[in-house]
Amino acid sequence: MEKVDTSGRLSKLRELMRAHSIDVYVVPSEDSHSSEYIAACDARREFISGFSGSAGCAVITLDKAALATDGRYFNQASKQLDHNWLLLKQGLQDVPTWQDWSAEQSAGGKIVAVDPELIAAAAAKKLAAKIHKFGGSELVALERNLVDVVWGKDRPDRPRNPVVILDTAFSGKNVETKLRDLRQELVKKDSLGMVVSMLDEVAWLLNLRGSDIPYNPVFFSYAVITLDTATLFVDDTKLHPDSLEYLRKNGIVTKPYSCIFDDVKALTSSKGVQGREKRTLLSSKASWALKRALGGDDLVEEVRSFIGDAKAVKNEAELAGMRACHIRDGIALIEYFAWLEDQLVAKRIVLDEVEAADKLEELRQKQENYVGLSFDTISSTGANAAVIHYKPERGSCPAIDPEAIYLCDSGAQYLDGTTDVTRTVHFGCPTAAEKLAYTLVLKGNIALDSAIFPKGTTGFALDCLARQHLWREGLDYRHGTGHGVGSYLNVHEGPIGIGTRVQFAEVSLASGNVVSIEPGFYEDGAFGIRIENLAIVREVQTQHSFGDKPYLGFEHVTMAPYCKNLIDISILTTAEKEWLNAHNTDIFNKTKDAFKDDALTLAWLTRETQPI
């Protein structure tokens, strides 16, 4: 990972800050739609800081610069940030949040500015209150993005890729039904309508997909839904005649993407039940710019999105697709690991991290309904595996060492579902420490996968099940244990998750959710271990039903064996061995027929799924 010299960029930015009488400038990671993963044209924080991770916030003053990020990226950020930057390791004791650091730098009535399109309205409100309380300072919405000015002509163009229709056979619910369900919620809230700004929510609601953001099948758009109208704000160059006709048949009007702010201003308040003013609903993740355009607190009600909640609970067609695509994805993974071992060990061929990742992509491309990858493949050998979101660079990454840990975190987009899986393997003789760490992580994975819990339980409450065996050894990991996953949509999907963050205590898991289970352990400079499966949350039968509550459990859908070479069988319980054997039998039975004419892969699969 090479450092970028940001001195010139920061100097130009500070000149602009002085010209606008700004003392502190905040550069978030997100785009205008609060997207975690963004198009190249929206990578402003990366451009100004040199840090390429998916999460973080840059704060620049007239003489300092700080980059805040979470535990997934401490290692990466320390390697990528140059001498101009202070790294704020969020979540560590005595390290201020970027909001607190901004407030400290603004003390004394200074001006803090941010592009209002790039920060959620709720986040802007909290930041404004914090800096005002700290030193009487003011948060200013600066609509001219100063990083864009510094970037200039080198800034990439905004993608204008075509929009495609997702067949109801895959979505499981037509647009008419989804709009009806949303309008029922609008009636319950006695609201004028809802502005939909999250890209995956627009795509899900209208059964459309795109490719404007790498690995995420979404397209730049907004939607405004009222009780009797539906408007899609999108560049018309994206819409082919079939898409236009599809939208027309479903009563959806199209307008240019750039018209959203002017149009929402026309959504005026009217009297509702009991004579109160009707408000327009806005997701709690929507931008400050949208809220300002709608008229502020008096005319807007921020809510947890009904669409996000509905999207997270997959219907039976989506769940069937998830099961099916994971079997096909598992076939590609099994073929990959068998091939990789043969290349590295039997044939002693030298392969680097990118060459291996390319082979895995090639194998996935052969599978039915394949569209593309769901994120950059993390193909990492040895110490690189300790970089949680490592990205190998073509032409400069190391060769895979068969005598070291190899971690591969990968996934794909299929028309019938989205996959995300991590397997950690060792083709040689692992150390006792590596085997212990791997087995502790495996035990945590099994513990969470086996959990049964009452309806209403949150991912926050379940998180410790995955960490318990590491904790007993004084070990842990600095990332969440699980995230929601879309159905041929974003690989990271809210509002659910499993982890220690506050938001995971706010939304309980529900039958139909798809979530990852991915404990890990990372020894900086040495090795990293992560084991990740996707699982469907399902109602389970229990002998009793205390409080008349249904009970839930997990149905794992990932079909890839664990690394037997890294398992210390002596510390597995009988129940854990039984779970592992049942899991391996399931994998073998669902994938073996694909290898009838592939003796090498079938032999590898048979060996790796033998009972222990």
UniProtKB/Swiss-Prot annotation:
Keywords: Aminopeptidase, Hydrolase, Manganese, Metal-binding, Metalloprotease, Protease. Disulfide bonds: none annotated. CDD domains: APP. Mn(2+) 2 binds at D409, D420, E532. Its cofactor is Mn(2+). Coiled coil: none annotated. It catalyses: Release of any N-terminal amino acid, including proline, that is linked to proline, even from a dipeptide or tripeptide. Its EC number is 3.4.11.9. It comes from the Eukaryota. Mn(2+) 1 binds at D420, E518, E532. Belongs to the peptidase M24B family. This is Probable Xaa-Pro aminopeptidase P. It comes from Verticillium alfalfae (strain VaMs.102 / ATCC MYA-4576 / FGSC 10136) (Verticillium wilt of alfalfa). The lineage of its organism: Eukaryota, Fungi, Dikarya, Ascomycota, Pezizomycotina.
